[in-house]
Design a protein with these regions (language model features):
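Generic low-complexity, intrinsically disordered sequence content enriched
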Residues: 12-17, 35, 71, 222
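Short linear motifs in intrinsically disordered/low-complexity regions
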Residues: 4-8, 92, 99, 227, ...
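Acidic, contiguous N-terminal accessory segments
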Residues: 20-167
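Bacterial Sec-dependent N-terminal signal peptides
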Residues: 1-30
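Low-complexity, compositionally biased segments
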Residues: 6-8, 67, 101, 175
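Feature activates predominantly on carbohydrate-active enzymes
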Residues: 101-251
């Protein structure tokens, strides 16, 4: 009985500690893929009508374009105009380049006063923004205004980099038809998950699926076939090993 009482007391203590932690830091960090290193902190950074973006001069045109697209999507869904600032300040998103970091790595510091993104390359900035978007309300991925949402992100320090250089998805349109909008949606989902390669299986013996006006017979002839050719009878087994297999009967 004493052991049981001790066990119940321990369970009660654990539940109490978990409850206290939840009250101190109610933030949720639902990220895919989960970062390599993250320190969760209390508080939130709130986007308001005065929030601006400062892009360090060494970032270059590509990073400016990436931030412009983010600001456009944010304005469409949150109804807040994220203007580009000429210098850093409070309640800002600050983007900097650090060439000592690995190619696709990023560092994200979110405090109550600002969001700092540091990366070595434009791709690192992209992945940092994808993390920010995952921390925002899901409405950020929509097409309509959702001004009533809580447009804020939980405070945290995140250091992240991909484990694999090739992170891809295979899309077979030779056997399965997809519209252009469906392909774009797949690319958007890939971006959310920080994938970097689309293996687009455009053609196969089933047909040619890409119309090229200069070569019309590719689709006139190559887009259809009467049958699938198979070899029904195999002969001349020589039982000789080849490529790890015998050229005899293989089941």
């Amino acid at each position: 009985m004493k052991n049981m009482n001790r066990y119940l007391a321990l369970v009660a203590l654990i539940i109490s500690l978990i409850s206290c932690q939840s009250e101190d830091n109610p933030n949720r960090y639902e990220l895919i893929p989960y970062p390599n290193d993250m320190e969760q902190m209390s508080g939130r950074f709130s986007f308001d009508d005065d929030t601006q973006i400062f892009i360090s001069p060494e970032c270059g045109d590509e990073v400016n374009e990436i931030l412009a697209r983010f600001a456009e999507q944010f304005g469409k869904t949150a109804g807040k105009d994220l203007k580009i600032a000429e210098k850093g300040g409070k309640n800002m998103m600050i983007v900097k380049i650090d060439t000592t970091m690995s190619q696709e790595a990023y560092r994200l510091n979110i405090s109550k006063k600002k969001i700092e993104i540091t990366a070595a390359t434009p791709n690192g900035v992209r992945y940092a923004l994808q993390t920010v978007k995952q921390l925002l309300p899901v409405a950020i991925y929509g097409e309509s205004l959702s001004a009533d949402e809580n447009w804020s992100v939980p405070c945290a320090t995140i250091n992240d980099a991909p484990r694999f250089g090739y992170r891809g998805m295979h899309l077979d349109v030779a056997r399965h038809f997809f519209t252009l909008d469906e392909v774009k949606r797949i690319l958007n989902v890939m971006a959310v998950h920080k994938l970097n390669t689309l293996h687009w299986h455009l053609t196969d013996d089933q047909g040619w699926r890409v119309e090229i006006k200069k070569y019309p017979r590719l689709t006139e002839v190559g887009s259809i076939r009467n049958k699938t050719m198979i070899r029904k009878e195999w002969d001349n087994y020589d039982t000789t090993p080849y490529g790890g297999l015998y050229t005899g009967r293989i089941t």
